Structure formats: C-alpha cells, structure tokens
C-alpha cells in the first residue's frame, strides 16, 4: 500500500520522540505544504528505515563494517529513489572506484525486491588499514556513481553518472540531483550497527 502524509502549517504537532517497532522497514513519502506567513517552502521527501532487509543482506556477505555501513546507506538511498520516480522496473545505484572498495552495487524493483553487494581488496582490510574508515571517498578513491532506471516494456532506459565526492553515498547523490535534475535536494542518512542489527 502506498501512503502519503500531507502536512499543513496547522496540522504539524511537534514531538521529541519518533518510535517504531525495531524491525519495521518502510519508505514513507511526505509532503509539507509550506506557509506563506512563516515563509517556509513546500517540501517533498521520504523517510526510510530498512532494518530487516539490510541486516539480512549484509549478514550473507560478511563484509568489514566500513563496507557494511556504506552498503547499508546505498540500500536506503536506492530504496528512497525507487519511490521517487514512476518506476515499473528496476532502479540501480552502482559505484566504481580505484580504492580498496572497488565496486558498490544496489538495485530495487518496483515490487520492492532489494539486492546489494560490494567488491573490495581483502588484503587491505586484513592489514587493518581501513577498518576505522567509513568515508566513501577514502574507501573508493577516484571513481564514479551511476544511477540507472530500466522500465519494463518499450520505455527508455535512463542513466545518470556523477563523480564520487564527499564522505557518504548521500553526498554523491546530492551532487547528481543538483547537476542532473536541477532540484534542490538534501539527503540526511544515518547508519548504525546495534548488536547484530543494522
């Protein structure tokens, strides 16, 4: 089911807590109508939480934690993107670099099926050179990130490419939105391992 919250200036009630059951996963669209009197803009966005699918995928691969963290962020960003576009097919986020993390891949279908994997230099991580570094640009070095939308049927394939930049997947995606879509975009992501869950 698709849900969308539309919140106007008189509807918003502030709370210092937002809680959900620990394993619930969702992508929730929202729309803030803005207020001429308060001079606030209209804002469309997504709130995403993917505990169970991210944990299941990462547990299958046994990657070092810095790679798990970047891959988890990529899954969240790709899942949000999949609900942003009219999708009847697959959206793919793929990054290639010449650092110790060489490949990052994630795709989501219009049915919500999620896949993700990474390729990396095991020796570099075995020597503990990168075990404390969670920054995308440091781990991938020079490279690019590509976004591909493949629609079912006769629709065209779309691909956008941007150079890797910043510390996170969200930083590179933000640059892509700014350059390609020319839409002011802000992505705020947070990834954390709590016990055995991501």
Regions found by a protein language model. Name each.
Residues 4-198:
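Interaction interfaces in information-processing and related assembly proteins
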